[in-house]
Amino acid sequence: MSKPKRERSLPENEAKAIARMLRVSPQKLNLVAQLIRGRKASAALADLQFSRKRIAGDVKKCLESAIANAENNHDLDVDELIVSEAFVGNGMVMKRFAPRGRGRSGRIYKPFSQLTIVVRQVEAEASA
């Protein structure tokens, strides 16, 4: 006996992927998320491929996962996908201490972030 299946929270033409415990501040991660928001999935992958930001590789991995979820789990056409949402959330913060002068110590924050990417299939517009 198992639990009843939960209803799908996304519409039928959307798929998502979540990356948790990314070792970067949410502010820096949001700079990369803004690059891909609203773009075609293929163009977003190309942008991330050549981005010089360190976290761009992890964002690319999450986007590839969202595209694979759309293709394999929801039977969506990969060529018609756009990044409809890319948002960043706070994760945990590791706190460390660094020795300072005169026997004191300073606190160092090492933040983590969460990234959610939602891809949506848009119908190809009929060109007349």
UniProtKB/Swiss-Prot annotation:
InterPro entries: Ribosomal_uL22, Ribosomal_uL22_bac/chlpt-type, Ribosomal_uL22_bac/org-type, Ribosomal_uL22_sf. CDD domains: Ribosomal_L22. It comes from the Bacteria. Keywords: Ribonucleoprotein, Ribosomal protein, RNA-binding, rRNA-binding. The keyword rRNA-binding applies. One of its GO terms (molecular function) is rRNA binding. GO terms for biological process: translation. Pfam families: Ribosomal_L22. One of its GO terms (cellular component) is cytosolic large ribosomal subunit. Belongs to the universal ribosomal protein uL22 family. Part of the 50S ribosomal subunit. This protein binds specifically to 23S rRNA; its binding is stimulated by other ribosomal proteins, e.g. L4, L17, and L20. It is important during the early stages of 50S assembly. It makes multiple contacts with different domains of the 23S rRNA in the assembled 50S subunit and ribosome. This is Large ribosomal subunit protein uL22. The lineage of its organism: Bacteria, Pseudomonadati, Pseudomonadota, Alphaproteobacteria, Hyphomicrobiales. The gene is rplV.
